């Protein structure tokens, strides 16, 4: 664990919005008197009807979370209209295509027109306030237009990552009963086409079998590639927007009206629809974007995430645009045409603030420094990381090589459920320790508790909980409030349980140690082990499967699968490849197994429970101390698993 400290550099402190003194003062007020603090900072967005109530939350009983509840606003208005008078000609979105020679710039005035037209197309086809619209798009500006158009008319968007399979897309369409889908003919990633429209068609057939019928599909033409077409259902975006006006008044939304649903992996296998509402979410996304990235007007800001993840929602679209920023949207991948792409884009567009994932940093670090140093990167002044803890070696490389030892590295810990940053340094206020997410953001009260729920004081290792609500917090699991209570509030009564383990050091800095539940963090993306297990078991030769994570040099966590086959079948390399393909088809490439070990049996207790602790140890090639195995029904199973492990690092 690194204990090296990087103090706040003088030049950073000199221009920062928040210094140490202000951080301490504001933080104290935010936790001692949240009504007063958020009552003041809620005014950073425009309200049609000002709120008089600030915080109305309870983490016990039925669990109810309401912020600014009697206020009325509109997210699209705050991200576009309010900037037009003074900054209409400023660039809102820089789009950098997969092909390095293709890019475009969209001003706030142009963004207004695009969003109003798309909103009018939705209205023309019967989409109303409260209806759910599924967005299955690549990283093109139309994805942002679609989100903002939904927000403008009060429709609830559900963005599904373009790398997910038709089956995963169908499950998300069915869960929120969405009848309108926005997609495009094909996406492009690393020079290769992605069949989004064909995937959508397949997903719609699967959804129809579950009695959810999609009535309209709006299709953006990206490549001009051939796709299936259903006349009467499918609509070309370019034809539709030509038939409507470029004016659409924003609907007055209550602060607690839903803004979006975003599905995230749970430990039970069925993805959870995380529901975020309008007012509190936008206040929090906007405020964290400004202070965590020390955003100054005129900065060029680039977050490399996909809009299919919460990072894309909060820190490509809503946070930056609400702050009248110029936000860069990147369609491509870090290693196409080669591993220098990120750094070339930074030079090309004079990027000042750069936010990416540790998994990308580790893979680019492995490619060598030359790809970085052949670019100037002189425009950079701040680097950020998101998605998983960053190991100190990758942190130092990012700081020394990418940032030339002059850009603070802002390691942000947060979740789909939190809406925005929770534990993070503020660049002008907090000395940095490589590998630590450092200290809580305003209004965030972290607590470490032991397995019995006892709150630990001082330097300690424990389960990370949050003791009180903050405005960006999710409000419920869509359609299943009981699951919301059970998942987040039943383990430690009266506290929000994050599912993460954490260490607090003697300086009060927080170090995230990883998931403590059955959720994997693969390349910064959450995947439930149960999802991967059920995908494996759906193959006709598999009788049983257990999935665990193990340390992976690039992805952070790899996916290790133990598979028991139907009687009479042998495990072969061909079958291994077939199972990898099968999982990719069921969930998407993100869930590709890294290791598959064929096993005659799994270690179970006499009551039939799989002992995952043992499977984790074997996957980590660390089986010297397996702990208590006395409850195993068949101890010989373990010897076989050890002998045939796929991760032999030792003789």
Curated annotation (Swiss-Prot):
GO cellular component, one term: cytosol
Modifications the protein undergoes after translation, according to the UniProt entry: Acetylated. Deacetylation by the SIR2-homolog deacetylase activates the enzyme.
Any GO BP annotation: acetyl-CoA biosynthetic process from acetate
Binding site for Mg(2+): 537, 539, 542
Positions of modified residues (N6-acetyllysine): 609
Similarity field: Belongs to the ATP-dependent AMP-binding enzyme family.
A GO term for molecular function: ATP binding
Residues that hold CoA according to the record: 189-192, 311, 335, 523, 584
Alphabetical keyword list: Acetylation, ATP-binding, Ligase, Magnesium, Metal-binding, Nucleotide-binding
Binding-site list for ATP: 387-389, 411-416, 500, 515, 526
Known cofactor(s): Mg(2+)
Role, per record: Catalyzes the conversion of acetate into acetyl-CoA (AcCoA), an essential intermediate at the junction of anabolic and catabolic pathways. AcsA undergoes a two-step reaction. In the first half reaction, AcsA combines acetate with ATP to form acetyl-adenylate (AcAMP) intermediate. In the second half reaction, it can then transfer the acetyl group from AcAMP to the sulfhydryl group of CoA, forming the product AcCoA.
Source superkingdom: Bacteria
Protein name: Acetyl-coenzyme A synthetase
Entry keyword Kinase: no
UniProt catalytic activity: acetate + ATP + CoA = acetyl-CoA + AMP + diphosphate
Organism whose genome encodes this protein: Rhizobium etli (strain ATCC 51251 / DSM 11541 / JCM 21823 / NBRC 15573 / CFN 42)
Pfam families (alphabetical): ACAS_N (PF16177), AMP-binding (PF00501), AMP-binding_C (PF13193)
Top enzyme category: ligase
Enzyme Commission (EC) number: 6.2.1.1
Leader sequence segment: none
């Amino acid at each position: 664990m690194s204990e090296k400290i990087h103090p706040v550099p003088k030049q950073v402190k000199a221009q920062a919005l928040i210094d140490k003194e202000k951080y301490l003062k504001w933080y104290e007020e935010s936790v001692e008197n949240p009504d007063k603090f958020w009552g003041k900072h809620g005014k950073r967005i425009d309200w049609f009807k000002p709120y008089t109530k600030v915080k109305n939350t309870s983490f016990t009983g039925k669990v109810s979370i309401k912020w600014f509840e009697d206020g009325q606003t509109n997210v699209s208005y705050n991200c576009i209209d309010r900037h037009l008078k003074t900054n209409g000609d400023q660039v809102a979105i820089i789009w950098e295509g997969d092909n390095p020679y293709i890019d475009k710039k969209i001003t706030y005035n142009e963004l207004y027109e695009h969003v109003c037209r798309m909103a009018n197309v939705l209205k023309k086809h019967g989409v109303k306030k409260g209806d759910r619209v599924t967005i299955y798009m690549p990283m093109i500006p139309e994805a942002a237009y679609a989100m903002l158009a939904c927000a403008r008319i009060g429709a609830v968007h559900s963005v599904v990552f373009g790398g997910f399979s038709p089956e995963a897309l169908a499950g998300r369409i069915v869960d929120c009963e969405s009848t309108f889908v926005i997609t495009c003919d094909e996406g492009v990633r690393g020079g290769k086409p992605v069949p989004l429209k064909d995937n959508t068609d397949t997903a719609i057939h699967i959804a129809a079998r579950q009695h959810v019928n999609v009535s309209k599909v709006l299709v953006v033409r990206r490549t001009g590639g051939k796709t299936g077409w259903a006349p009467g259902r499918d609509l070309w975006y370019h034809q539709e927007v030509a038939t409507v006006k470029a004016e659409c008044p924003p609907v007055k939304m209550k602060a607690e009206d839903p803004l979006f649903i975003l599905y995230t992996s749970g430990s039970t296998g069925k993805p959870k629809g995380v529901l975020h509402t309008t007012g509190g979410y936008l206040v929090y996304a906007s405020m964290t974007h400004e202070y965590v990235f020390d955003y100054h007007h005129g900065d060029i800001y680039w977050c490399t995430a996909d809009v299919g993840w919460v990072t894309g929602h909060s820190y490509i679209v809503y946070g930056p645009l609400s702050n009248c920023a110029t936000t860069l949207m990147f369609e491509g991948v870090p290693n196409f045409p080669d591993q220098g792409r990120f750094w070339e884009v930074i030079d090309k567009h004079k990027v000042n603030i750069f936010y990416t994932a540790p998994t990308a940093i580790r893979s680019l670090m492995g490619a060598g420094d030359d790809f970085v140093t052949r670019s100037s990167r002189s425009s950079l002044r701040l680097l950020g990381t998101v998605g998983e803890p960053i190991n100190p070696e990758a942190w130092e490389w990012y700081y020394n090589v990418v940032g030339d030892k002059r850009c603070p590295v802002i390691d942000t810990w947060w979740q789909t459920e939190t809406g925005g940053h929770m534990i993070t340094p503020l660049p002008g206020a907090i000395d940095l320790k490589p590998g630590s997410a450092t200290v809580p953001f305003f209004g965030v009260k972290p607590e470490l508790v032991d397995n019995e729920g006892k709150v630990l004081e001082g330097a300690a290792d424990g389960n990370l909980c949050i003791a009180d609500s903050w405005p960006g917090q999710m409000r419920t699991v869509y359609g299943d409030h009981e699951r919301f209570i059970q998942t987040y509030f039943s383990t430690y009564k009266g506290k929000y349980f994050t599912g993460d383990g954490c260490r607090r050091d003697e300086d009060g800095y927080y170090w995230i140690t990883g998931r403590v539940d059955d959720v994997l963090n693969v390349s910064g993306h959450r995947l439930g082990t149960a999802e991967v297990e059920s995908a494996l078991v759906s193959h006709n030769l598999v009788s049983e499967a257990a999935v665990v994570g193990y340390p992976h040099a690039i992805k952070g966590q790899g996916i290790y699968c133990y598979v028991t086959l139907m009687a009479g079948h042998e495990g072969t390399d061909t079958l291994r490849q077939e199972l990898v393909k099968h999982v990719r088809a069921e969930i998407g490439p993100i869930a590709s197994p890294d290791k598959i070990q064929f096993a005659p049996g799994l270690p179970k207790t006499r009551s039939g429970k799989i002992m995952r602790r043992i499977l984790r140890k074997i996957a980590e090639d660390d089986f010297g101390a397996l702990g208590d195995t006395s409850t195993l029904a068949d101890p010989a199973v373990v010897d076989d698993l050890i002998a045939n492990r796929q991760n032999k690092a030792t003789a």
